[in-house]
């Protein structure tokens, strides 16, 4: 496993379905998210957008940056013909959940994970 961030980024974008979107302020990266377009065998939502790793620098939270990023993600998802946008959020992040609900998202599923490598 390669823990070099540059190699991780290159692997992430290699298939062309995932983008890393970075928000900049005064020449400094202050926010980011990953957007992956998923093509599924699902009659109701054959193309979905998966958002992951939404981050805003702590001292800049509450200034609308996160909301602007999520609007950007929606615009990109629609441009890719996605009919649904989804993401996961740690169950302990109540403030983040309320933020997403204010943006119109609904909690619809329970998430499950399984480590495939020993840690």
Report the location of each language-model feature.
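Active-site rim helix/loop that mediates acceptor-substrate recognition in acyltransferases
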Residues: 1-20
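Conserved beta-strand in the GNAT
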Residues: 22, 28-37, 55
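Short coil/turn motifs at secondary-structure junctions
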Residues: 38-40, 56-59, 92-94, 117
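A conserved beta-turn-beta hairpin within the catalytic core of GNAT-like acetyltransferases
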Residues: 40-51, 61, 108
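Conserved acetyl-CoA-binding loop-helix of GNAT-fold acetyltransferases
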Residues: 53-56, 62-75, 98, 102
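Conserved GNAT acetyl-CoA-binding A-motif
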Residues: 70, 77-89
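Conserved beta-strand-loop-alpha-helix junction that forms the acyl-donor binding cleft
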Residues: 86-96, 113-118
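Conserved acetyl-CoA-binding loop of GNAT-fold acetyltransferases
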Residues: 100-110
